[in-house]
């Protein structure tokens, strides 16, 4: 497709994803803080009947001819690898928080094209905050434009992430301000996109569904989100799992990456 057609198609898809994750949020809220069946899967990872209900809703609403599908709660059949474009979904990102009745969980959907996100939606149902982005169109929260914070200073920067990584950062600059951990990883990185925090780390073993939507939101908000060697993340690979990650406004990201690179072993 010509670039302008592609952009308008992505913008239309962003609106569609926005409606879908909002509706999915209403499904999740019906179960929230009420009696709910939950169990564990894999490495002690919680899953609930709400995760499954939201997953089924999003799959029915979004999946279509010509697009692959990858979701935390769907069986990965790997036919997605033959698709240039696919939906990547996390029905409830932050299930532990959701089951504990906390507010830091979200519903996440992205469209990835040739390994990079081109459309993103992150919805925080408790606060009714909808974050949307389409490639080249900027990023919004509830319709208003958002941007990462400017500047490159580490001193006074509000940073979220795993405790261990933040403690290592303190040894470099004790003036950094550690934000409370945001359990939904997509929401943690999206807080960087909207400038509510200045930077965020993710430890190793985050998955495509945790990262793809937030990646686009951060970039469209004027920031950068990469692995700790500064490379862009590639999605829809055979194994959809990533190493440690840093997100921040562009200048701060470059400065922090420089510091982290010099101490790579401490942060990996």
Name these PLM-found stretches.
Residues 149-268:
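An extended, acidic
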Residues 28, 51, 62, 95, ...:
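Residue-level signal for inorganic ion chemistry
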Residues 141-148:
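A structural micro-motif at secondary-structure boundaries
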Residues 71-73, 143, 229:
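Short loop/edge segments at beta-strand edges and connector loops
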């Amino acid at each position: 497709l010509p670039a302008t057609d592609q952009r308008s198609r992505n913008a239309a898809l962003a609106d569609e994803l926005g409606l879908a994750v909002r509706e999915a949020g209403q499904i999740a809220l019906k179960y929230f803080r009420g009696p709910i069946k939950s169990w564990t899967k894999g490495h002690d990872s919680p899953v609930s009947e709400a995760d499954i209900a939201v997953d089924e809703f999003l799959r029915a609403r979004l999946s279509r001819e010509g697009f692959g599908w990858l979701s935390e709660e769907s069986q990965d059949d790997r036919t997605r690898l033959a698709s240039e474009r696919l939906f990547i979904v996390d029905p409830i990102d932050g299930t532990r928080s959701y089951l504990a009745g906390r507010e830091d969980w979200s519903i996440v959907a992205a469209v990835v094209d040739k390994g990079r996100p081109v459309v993103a939606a992150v919805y925080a149902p408790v606060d009714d905050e909808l974050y949307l982005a389409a490639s080249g169109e900027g990023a919004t929260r509830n319709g208003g434009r958002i941007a990462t914070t400017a500047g490159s200073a580490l001193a006074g920067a509000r940073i979220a992430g795993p405790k261990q990584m933040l403690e290592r950062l303190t040894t470099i600059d004790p003036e950094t301000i550690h934000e409370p951990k945001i359990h939904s990883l997509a929401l943690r990185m999206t807080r960087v996109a909207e400038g509510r925090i200045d930077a965020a780390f993710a430890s190793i073993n985050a998955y495509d569904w945790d990262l793809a939507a937030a990646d686009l939101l951060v970039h469209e908000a004027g920031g950068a989100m990469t692995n700790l060697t500064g490379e862009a993340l590639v999605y829809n690979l055979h194994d959809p799992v990533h190493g440690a990650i840093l997100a921040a406004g562009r200048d701060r990201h470059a400065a922090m990456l420089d510091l982290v690179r010099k101490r790579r072993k401490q942060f990996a």
